[in-house]
């Protein structure tokens, strides 16, 4: 199901998007504050109002949690144990795609930390999200729009596959897979493998919303058509991918601290980090 259709389904089933709307910020946390000041050249005294204004414009059109709760200014990529490797590899010329990148905020972290923008790609199904990223970071002159691709990862005829199939070294996926059911996630994983170079060391790094309580998980899926993993289902997903593709993969997973957990309305939620490397 398309994410927009999922949102409409959730609203029809009684979900109140106001639950996803956080009061305007009074401060902007690091590293986004410094990125906006130094990368985007937003005046120091305008940073907070700039972020609030972009959020309100975006939420009026797309009442998603990532927008309403300012997730786009709570960067997480640097919290991954794989970040130093991703940063060094992209500095050396390896190509990274942030799949489901929303505003492309994690790409700006990599650029701020020294990765050449031409080694980075972002893709989201919503072109408007990519545009809002430019509204937030004011950096069209730094990150060419040719590096950002509006596409559906399930559509292998899309510009994403036309341009990048077999060309990438790393794909980063953060809080995106849960919008697909288990079977669709298998397809997404297979498609992502097709975007990567077919060589040892090609890597997928994931940040996944997970749930320990299967009863809560089942109730959530009845109300909102999302699929939150637990560790067992996550491992089962990749075993199935290996079985169907014949590709040898090494999967490592861990629980990682995350601000999202503190404000998530469901009990038993945690963030599952994972790296999937081609052998």
UniProtKB/Swiss-Prot annotation:
This is Methyltransferase ausD. GO terms for biological process: methylation; terpenoid biosynthetic process. The gene is ausD. In A.calidoustus, the austinoid gene cluster lies on a contiguous DNA region, while clusters from E.nidulans and P.brasilianum are split in their respective genomes. Genetic rearrangements provoked variability among the clusters and E.nidulans produces the least number of austionoid derivatives with the end products austinol and dehydroaustinol, while P.brasilianum can produce until acetoxydehydroaustin, and A.calidoustus produces the highest number of identified derivatives. Belongs to the class I-like SAM-binding methyltransferase superfamily. S-adenosyl-L-methionine binds at residues 124-125, 152-153. Methyltransferase; part of the gene cluster A that mediates the biosynthesis of the fungal meroterpenoid acetoxydehydroaustin. The first step of the pathway is the synthesis of 3,5-dimethylorsellinic acid by the polyketide synthase ausA. 3,5-dimethylorsellinic acid is then prenylated by the polyprenyl transferase ausN. Further epoxidation by the FAD-dependent monooxygenase ausM and cyclization by the probable terpene cyclase ausL lead to the formation of protoaustinoid A. The lineage of its organism: Eukaryota, Fungi, Dikarya, Ascomycota, Pezizomycotina. Pathway: Secondary metabolite biosynthesis; terpenoid biosynthesis. The keyword Methyltransferase applies. InterPro entries: Meroterpenoid_MTases, SAM-dependent_MTases_sf. Its EC number is 2.1.3.-. The keyword Signal does not apply. One of its GO terms (molecular function) is methyltransferase activity. It comes from Penicillium brasilianum. It is an enzyme of class 2 (transferase). Keywords: Methyltransferase, S-adenosyl-L-methionine, Transferase. Homodimer. It comes from the Eukaryota.
């Amino acid at each position: 199901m398309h994410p927009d259709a999922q949102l409409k389904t959730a609203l029809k089933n009684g979900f109140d998007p106001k639950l996803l709307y956080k009061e305007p910020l009074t401060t902007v946390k690091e590293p986004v504050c410094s990125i906006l000041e130094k990368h985007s050249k937003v005046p120091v005294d305008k940073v907070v109002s700039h972020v609030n204004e972009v959020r309100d414009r975006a939420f009026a059109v797309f009442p998603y949690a990532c927008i309403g709760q300012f997730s786009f200014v709570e960067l997480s990529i640097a919290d991954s144990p794989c970040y130093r490797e991703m940063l060094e590899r992209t500095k050396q010329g390896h190509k990274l795609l942030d799949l489901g990148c929303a505003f492309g905020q994690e790409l700006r972290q990599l650029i701020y930390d020294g990765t050449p923008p031409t080694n980075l790609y972002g893709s989201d199904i919503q072109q408007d999200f990519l545009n809002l990223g430019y509204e937030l970071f004011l950096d069209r002159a730094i990150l060419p729009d040719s590096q950002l691709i509006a596409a559906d990862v399930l559509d292998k005829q899309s510009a994403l596959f036309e341009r990048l199939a077999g060309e990438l070294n790393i794909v980063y996926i953060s809080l995106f897979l849960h919008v697909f059911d288990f079977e669709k996630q298998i397809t997404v994983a297979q498609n992502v493998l097709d975007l990567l170079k077919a060589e040892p060391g090609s890597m997928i790094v994931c940040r996944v919303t997970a749930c320990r309580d299967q009863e809560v998980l089942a109730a959530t899926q009845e109300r909102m058509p999302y699929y939150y993993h637990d560790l067992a289902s996550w491992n089962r997903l990749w075993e199935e991918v290996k079985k169907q593709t014949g590709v040898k993969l090494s999967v490592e997973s861990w629980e990682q601290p995350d601000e999202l957990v503190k404000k998530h309305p469901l009990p038993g939620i945690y963030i599952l980090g994972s790296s999937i490397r081609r052998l």
